[in-house]
Amino acid sequence: KNSVYHSKNQVNALPIINLEYNRFYLKGYKPGFIFYKESDFNFSAIVDPIGGYSDFAIRKSQFKDGYKNLESRNTQVMGGIALDFKIDKNIDGHSEVVFGNHGTKVNIKLNRAYKVNDRVTFIPAVTFNYYNSKYMDYYIGIKEKDIQNNSKIEKTYKGKDTIAGGVSATLDMAMTEQTSFLVFGGIDIYDKKIKNSDIVRTNN
């Protein structure tokens, strides 16, 4: 993915495993438990074991020269509530609010599946994310010591509540009844205020 930071672009790989047993499930890499269910929506308790992985987490070794003495922005274990719902027979929605030691994130996603043939499904989606100030301060905040230790950082920055919107597309190719190969691509546009952090590139 293209990094929001002054860093090398990152290659992220994740196993996507979908399992269900009674009210327990694993979707992608997030386990959950459905505690309330109706025909067109359900509520779950969920855990994100690698919160931040898909947006702001980064190892210090990935920063470019002039930023290499920054500390890593690590993933975090987050937990919260998820809502899965149907707007109509074609459009599915997912929303979650998760909390961690380094802040809170809200996600809303709407997608629609188009069956290309018996084995291939095309799934476009739109997303909305909200990150609270604590979350953003951990990932893109800058302290005085960061200025002293990194030649290209000129000012401190305190993270602020931030929103982002995005579009994505997934191509789901069924290999067997139990196994699929997924190709995913997308773009996210962040609130312009994050550009006030010297560690963030200005073209996000």
Which positions does each model-derived feature cover?
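Predominantly the C-terminal beta-signal and adjacent terminal strand-loop region
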Residues: 172-204
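Outer-membrane beta-barrel "beta-signal"
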Residues: 14-18, 110, 204
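Short, solvent-exposed loop/turn segments at secondary-structure boundaries
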Residues: 4-8, 96, 196-198
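Residue-level detection of beta-strand scaffold positions
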Residues: 16, 46, 127, 182-184
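Short glycine/proline- and aromatic-enriched beta-strand/turn motifs that initiate or cap beta-hairpins
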Residues: 1-26, 32, 134
